[in-house]
UniProtKB/Swiss-Prot annotation:
Transmembrane segments: none annotated. The gene is coaD. This is Phosphopantetheine adenylyltransferase. Belongs to the bacterial CoaD family. One of its GO terms (biological process) is coenzyme A biosynthetic process. It is an enzyme of class 2 (transferase). Its cofactor is Mg(2+). The lineage of its organism: Bacteria, Pseudomonadati, Pseudomonadota, Betaproteobacteria, Nitrosomonadales. Keywords: ATP-binding, Coenzyme A biosynthesis, Cytoplasm, Magnesium, Nucleotide-binding, Nucleotidyltransferase, Transferase. Its main location: cytoplasm. Substrate binds at residues 9, 41, 73, 87. The keyword Transferase applies.
Length: 159
């Protein structure tokens, strides 16, 4: 069975993430959305909140599983017995970092391939960082995220 890992912080999960996951779900038998407990970032939402939102947003996809993880992505990939990682590239500026990361990952676990997908045109400009900033400043981020996520962003802003 072909299993792919789609890692990210998903803080929050956006329509762009959904687009890539939906497309990956057509290419692979199983997609594991790996929500990182990234210690290098200060997320707006807790790991548990991010996992819960992603599960709710992606519930319609029978071959998509959402799980949180901490530590090295390659160790998680090994534990999942997966051999492919999918990453999204929105712009050329994403490529250099992702290319370096893919090379480092390959040096740690040579059996794992990294595949890059570009988002559909209408999602190329969406980033979770920008979505959070729009919401934080009182703007309407609802067209960039699932309604559940938009509601959670609104609730965060009120606090």
């Amino acid at each position: 069975m072909d299993k792919v890992i789609y890692p990210g912080t998903f803080d929050p999960i956006t329509r762009g993430h959904e687009d890539l996951i939906q497309r990956a779900s057509r290419l692979f038998d199983q997609v594991v959305v790996a929500v990182a407990a990234n210690s290098g970032k200060s997320p707006c939402f807790s790991l548990e909140e991010r996992v819960e939102m992603a599960r709710a947003v992606l519930a319609e996809y029978a071959n998509v599983e959402v799980t949180g993880f901490s530590g090295l992505l390659m160790e998680f990939t090994r534990q999942q017995q997966a051999h492919v990682i999918v990453r999204g590239l929105r712009a050329v500026s994403d490529f250099e970092y992702e290319f370096q990361l893919a090379g480092m990952n390959r040096s740690l676990y040579p059996d794992v391939e990294t595949i890059f997908l570009t988002p559909s045109e209408q999602y190329m400009f969406i980033s979770a960082t920008i979505v959070r900033e729009i919401a934080r400043l009182g703007g309407d981020a609802s067209k960039f995220v699932h309604p559940l996520v938009a509601e959670r962003l609104y609730e965060k802003r009120k606090k």
